[in-house]
Amino acid sequence: MSFNPELATKTLEAEGLRCPEPVMMVRKTIRNMQDGEVLLVKADDPSTTRDIPSFCRFMDHQLIAAQTEQLPYQYLIKKGLE
């Protein structure tokens, strides 16, 4: 799937934050979202390229798309697996 930020129902600006802060912020934000909603995460910490996909697998969310070729890195995460 191509990266389409318009799919997002909520945006999390995590630029300037360093590990483990971006993933902690994602977890806190997603906790307050409804299943099926999509979170756009913008970050510039290189560790997010590893941590965000791992978080999604571990917490049973879907990483719909990721843009990691340029800064800021951007991720689309759908809450839940449905």
Swiss-Prot record:
Its main location: cytoplasm. Transmembrane segments: none annotated. Keywords: Cytoplasm. The keyword Cytoplasm applies. It comes from the Bacteria. PROSITE patterns: UPF0033. GO terms for biological process: tRNA wobble position uridine thiolation. Sulfur carrier protein which probably makes part of a sulfur-relay system. Belongs to the sulfur carrier protein TusA family. The active site is at residue 19. GO terms for cellular component: cytoplasm. Pfam families: TusA. This is Sulfur carrier protein TusA. InterPro entries: Sulphur_carrier_TusA, TusA-like, TusA-like_sf. The gene is tusA. It is found in: Cytoplasm. GO terms for molecular function: sulfur carrier activity.
